[in-house]
């Protein structure tokens, strides 16, 4: 009888997360799990089952100007993923993702059902980039010890909008006026150039999990 595979992180992985503010865990979800999640998300995307976030509603650079415009019904996110079916809930509670997050936090886990309870659906033509930001701008918790878990359902690289992060930026104290009214980093600010110069792309394969501190850019 085979022993169960541990989902725990090594001390080196914990140290790297604490230093860089993010950590890639390869092959955390099986091909079958990724296929089931992608199929369920695709069906709901095709049917435009709410709640949804549309590119046109956000108005980021390059987005359709309205829902009536060409590409105006392009969906950016399937929101409320936890309530969209058992396949999503099963993954949310999977030890492959819960155990390392619990280990990094050193505290009981709580799953937030607000902003990041979602499937990102980046469209090749109408999908838009998001400016540099920290995820904790979306939340109002007293303590900032929050971790986002991102599961790649397919390959993510420079050709299709892979995430970019700034290693160590979760520990950076910003200067006054370095964020705009929506808490996006003002890249023209004198103190931002050196920060953005450290940015790196996070390439992922289907099944890889990216964990990152909510204070990371």
Residue ranges of each PLM-predicted region?
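Non-heme Fe(II)-dependent double-stranded beta-helix
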Residues: 1-20, 26-132, 138-139
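Double-stranded beta-helix
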Residues: 2, 156-217
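Short, solvent-exposed loop/turn segments at secondary-structure junctions
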Residues: 30-31, 119-121, 137, 156, ...
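A structural signal for well-ordered alpha-helical segments within the folded catalytic domains
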Residues: 95-99, 147, 205
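Active-site region of the double-stranded beta-helix
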Residues: 107-110, 136, 141-144, 151-162, ...
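A structural signal for short, well-ordered beta-strand segments
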Residues: 117, 149-151
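Coil-to-beta-strand transition motifs
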Residues: 127, 144-146, 209
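A short beta-loop-beta micro-motif enriched in histidine and acidic residues
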Residues: 134-146, 197-198, 204
């Amino acid at each position: 009888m085979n022993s169960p595979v541990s989902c725990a992180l090594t001390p080196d992985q914990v140290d790297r997360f604490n230093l860089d503010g993010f950590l890639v865990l390869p092959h955390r979800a099986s091909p079958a799990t990724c296929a089931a999640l992608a199929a369920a998300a695709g069906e709901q995307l095709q049917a435009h089952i709410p709640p949804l976030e549309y590119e046109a509603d956000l108005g980021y650079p390059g987005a359709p100007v309205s829902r009536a415009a060409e590409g105006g019904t392009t969906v950016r996110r399937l929101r409320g993923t936890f309530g969209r079916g058992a396949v999503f809930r099963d993954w949310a509670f999977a030890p492959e993702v819960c155990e390392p997050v619990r280990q990094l936090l050193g505290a009981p886990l709580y799953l937030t059902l607000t902003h990041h309870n979602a499937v990102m659906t980046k469209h090749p033509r109408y999908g838009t980039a998001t400016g540099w930001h920290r995820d904790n701008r979306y939340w109002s918790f007293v303590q900032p010890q929050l971790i986002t878990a991102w599961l790649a359902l397919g390959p993510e690289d420079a050709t299709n909008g892979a995430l970019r992060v700034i290693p160590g930026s979760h520990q950076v104290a910003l200067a006054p006026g370095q964020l705009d009214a929506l808490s996006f980093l003002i890249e023209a600010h004198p103190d931002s150039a050196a920060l953005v110069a450290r940015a790196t792309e996070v390439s992922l394969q289907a099944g890889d999990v990216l964990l990152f501190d909510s204070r990371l850019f």
